[in-house]
Each structure stands twice: as C-alpha cells, then as structure tokens.
C-alpha cells in the first residue's frame, strides 16, 4: 500500500469520485434492495429502465437540455461518432465543414472524409496556423452557409488546448457538431447553440463503455435510410435507446456521477472549482522561471488537460517516475507530444492538484 494518497491524472479512463465508487461498492451485489446486481439486470427490466430514465433526466437537468433535444447513451466511443455524425447529418449536402485544432479533431476530420460522399471542407486548421499552440478564433472560421454542419472539438486532450468561450455561430449558419468528450459537465454552456453534442464517458461522465449523444430533433429528419440501423440515430431514438443492448453498468455508473455532481451544487459550482485547479497548476508552471514549460498561448490553455515539460526528455522521465512514487499517477504526456500531462477533470479533488503543485516545486528545487 502506498504511503501517499493516490491521485489519478490519467486522460481517460479517468478518476471517478470516491463517493461514487463507494456507492457502487455497496450496491455491487444488491442494487437498491432488489437482490440483483446491476451487471446482471436485463436491459429491458423495470429495474434498469428506471436507472436509465433517472440518468437521462439528471443529465438533462445538469445541462439544462431543451425539450427539443434527444439524449442517447450509445456504445463505440467518441471515435464512432466521428463517422456517425457525418453518416447521419451530411446526407444530401454538397459540403460539411470541420475545424482542426489538435489531435482528435484532426482524426475526426480524416475519418469523416472517408465515410461520406459529401466534401468535408477545412474551415480552420490550428496546426497550419499556430502549430497547435493557439486556437483559430471562431470569427476566422471559413464556414460555408450551405454546409451540412461544422464539426469541432472544444477541448483537445492531447495538445492541452481549450476554447475559453464555448464557440457559437450566428443564426442562419450550419449547426455545430461538437466533440465535448473531455470537458462536458465541467462548465456551463447553452445546449441550444449546438445541433449535436457527443462525449465519451470516460473523462467527465463515468467509466469507459458509454457515449453520450445529445441531438436536436429536427436534424433527425436528415438520417438516411440506406445506412445500417445500428449507425442511425433515428433507429436508436425510435427504440428508446434500446436498438441493441446498452452498456448497462456504465450507464448506472454515469448516473451515480450525475447525482454526485448535483450534490456538489451542479455545473456552475464545479466550474469554479475547475478554474481554481487549473490556476494552481499554471501559476506553478509560470512561476518556475522556465524550469517548467507550457507553450500554449494563455487564452487557449485547457482547464482540463494541463500539458508541460522540463528542459529535456530524461528529466521528464524522472519527473513521471518520482511523481508516481508519491502517489501522483499517470502523468506521462501523450506519445506524440511527450512531456507531462495532468488531466484534472471534475472528479480530481483540489487536494490532488495542490499535491502535484507541491511536488513540482520540490522537484524543481532538487533538479533546477
């Protein structure tokens, strides 16, 4: 057993609230006095349908989702949504637009380009413009008014970039399709500004295995009949999310996280905590006199994924190893970027961030 508290800074699957894990432990063999473990419940049983209903209603309340939006709990991860969004929403359109700001939006653009006859246009490219160290302002996006949609990722987990203000387009422009996997529920925004939102659960929602999709009802009219039902949003909605067996336990766990977030005071309260956590780390980096380096333009820095490095790769490796010995785990940066990455999603307590900042200062004292 570690001499230190264990703090999980993984980008995903990520830390879950301790209170949620405790509830899951207590209910592992007997959910709510039913005698059934959730993992062994039929997805069509009244017991599970109640879990699903409450999870959907709690998420709708937390995000203030309007009545004309449908919520789905699907499988396949956010990566599948790169394809599903294009397959469902681009049918009959000559073009759709994509904004590339980092690793995952780049992959989304590439995948969308393969699976539709619609031309996927680059509305903006942060790599070409800023070497992925800044974000192209929304007002500079080259959006075609008659495009099917505009796809973007609001937070880039690999590169440590995040739009300070959640992007929105003026009335009459194509609907926004947004990958919110690594920031959903971390700050307030208006769902009505978007046509479709999707998010893999394993960062801010729950364990891996479920993907949340929030889609405006009128867009479902676009879903073509010549794609497989399992990839058709309308098929899932027409069957109340039961087209195939959903990820029952991941949905149950996500529902527990929604209840936990409500108990914290909701999204507005957790947003203030997240702001303080990010500020703590960036002040440590900026106050290190160059020992720690974050090259992202300050206004584009992510509050969810803080990336940084030291002067050389060997020192970075030493940092990761020594941090883990003190219970600060999974800080190694993404393979294509290197350095370190501290993912500080909703469930990461402020104490964990402060422990990391203390370690960073001590490491600098010893090796600076």
Curated annotation (Swiss-Prot):
Binding site for pyridoxal 5'-phosphate: 78-79, 104, 157, 179, 202, 244-245
Coiled-coil ranges from the UniProt annotation: none
Subcellular location: Cytoplasm
Pfam families per the UniProt record, alphabetical: Aminotran_5 (PF00266)
Main location: cytoplasm
Molecular function per GO: O-phospho-L-serine:2-oxoglutarate aminotransferase activity; pyridoxal phosphate binding
Cytoplasm keyword on record: yes
CDD domains: PSAT_like (cd00611)
UniProt: L-glutamate binding residues: 44
Gene Ontology BP, a term: pyridoxine biosynthetic process
SUPFAM superfamilies: PLP-dependent transferases
Keywords attached to this entry: Amino-acid biosynthesis, Aminotransferase, Cytoplasm, Pyridoxal phosphate, Pyridoxine biosynthesis, Serine biosynthesis, Transferase
Modified residues (N6-(pyridoxal phosphate)lysine): 203
Residue ranges crossing the lipid bilayer per the database entry: none
Domain of life: Bacteria
Cofactor note text: Binds 1 pyridoxal phosphate per subunit.
Gene Ontology CC, one term: cytoplasm
Pathway listed: Amino-acid biosynthesis; L-serine biosynthesis; L-serine from 3-phospho-D-glycerate: step 2/3; Cofactor biosynthesis; pyridoxine 5'-phosphate biosynthesis; pyridoxine 5'-phosphate from D-erythrose 4-phosphate: step 3/5
InterPro entries: Aminotrans_V_dom, Aminotrans_V_PyrdxlP_BS, Pser_aminoTfrase, PyrdxlP-dep_Trfase, PyrdxlP-dep_Trfase_major, PyrdxlP-dep_Trfase_small
Catalytic activity: O-phospho-L-serine + 2-oxoglutarate = 3-phosphooxypyruvate + L-glutamate; 4-(phosphooxy)-L-threonine + 2-oxoglutarate = (R)-3-hydroxy-2-oxo-4-phosphooxybutanoate + L-glutamate
UniProt-listed Enzyme Commission number(s): 2.6.1.52
Function noted in UniProt: Catalyzes the reversible conversion of 3-phosphohydroxypyruvate to phosphoserine and of 3-hydroxy-2-oxo-4-phosphonooxybutanoate to phosphohydroxythreonine.
HAMAP family in the cross-refs: SerC_aminotrans_5
Protein family per UniProt: Belongs to the class-V pyridoxal-phosphate-dependent aminotransferase family. SerC subfamily.
Quaternary assembly: Homodimer.
Protein name as annotated: Phosphoserine aminotransferase
Source lineage: Bacteria, Pseudomonadati, Pseudomonadota, Betaproteobacteria, Neisseriales
């Amino acid at each position: 057993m570690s001499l230190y508290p264990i703090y999980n800074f993984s980008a995903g699957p990520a830390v879950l609230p301790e209170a949620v894990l405790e509830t899951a432990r207590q209910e592992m063999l007997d959910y709510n006095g039913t005698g059934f473990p959730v993992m062994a419940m039929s997805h069509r049983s009244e017991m599970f349908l109640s879990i699903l209903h409450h999870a959907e209603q709690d998420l709708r309340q937390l995000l203030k989702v309007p009545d004309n939006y449908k919520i789905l709990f699907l499988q396949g991860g956010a990566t599948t949504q790169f394809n599903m969004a294009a397959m469902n929403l681009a049918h009959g359109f000559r073009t759709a637009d994509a904004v590339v700001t980092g690793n995952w939006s780049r992959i989304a653009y590439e995948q969308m380009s393969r699976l539709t006859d619609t031309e996927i246009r680059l509305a903006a490219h942060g790599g070409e413009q800023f070497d992925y160290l800044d974000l192209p302002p929304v007002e500079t996006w080259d959006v075609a008014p008659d495009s099917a949609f505009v796809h973007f990722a609001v937070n880039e987990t690999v590169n440590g970039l995040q739009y300070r203000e959640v992007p929105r387009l003026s009335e009459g422009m194509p609907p926004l399709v947004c990958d919110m996997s690594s920031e959903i529920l971390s700050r307030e925004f208006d769902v009505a500004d978007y046509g479709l939102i999707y998010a893999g659960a394993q960062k801010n929602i729950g364990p891996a295995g479920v993907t949340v999709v929030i889609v405006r009802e009128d867009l479902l009219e676009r879903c073509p009949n010549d794609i497989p039902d399992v990839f058709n949003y309308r098929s899932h909605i027409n069957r109340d999310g039961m087209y195939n067996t959903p990820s029952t336990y991941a949905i149950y766990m996500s529902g527990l996280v929604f209840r936990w977030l409500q108990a914290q005071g909701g999204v507005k309260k957790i947003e203030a905590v997240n702001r303080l956590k990010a500020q703590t780390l960036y002040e440590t980096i900026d106050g290190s006199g160059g020992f720690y380096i974050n090259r992202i333009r300050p206004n584009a820095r992510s509050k969810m994924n803080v990336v940084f490095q030291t002067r050389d790769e060997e020192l970075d490796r030493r940092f990761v190893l020594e941090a883990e010995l003190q219970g600060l785990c999974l800080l190694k940066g993404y393979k294509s970027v290197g350095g370190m990455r501290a993912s500080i999603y909703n469930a990461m307590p402020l104490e964990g961030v402060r422990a990391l900042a203390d370690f960073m200062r001590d490491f600098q004292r010893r090796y600076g």
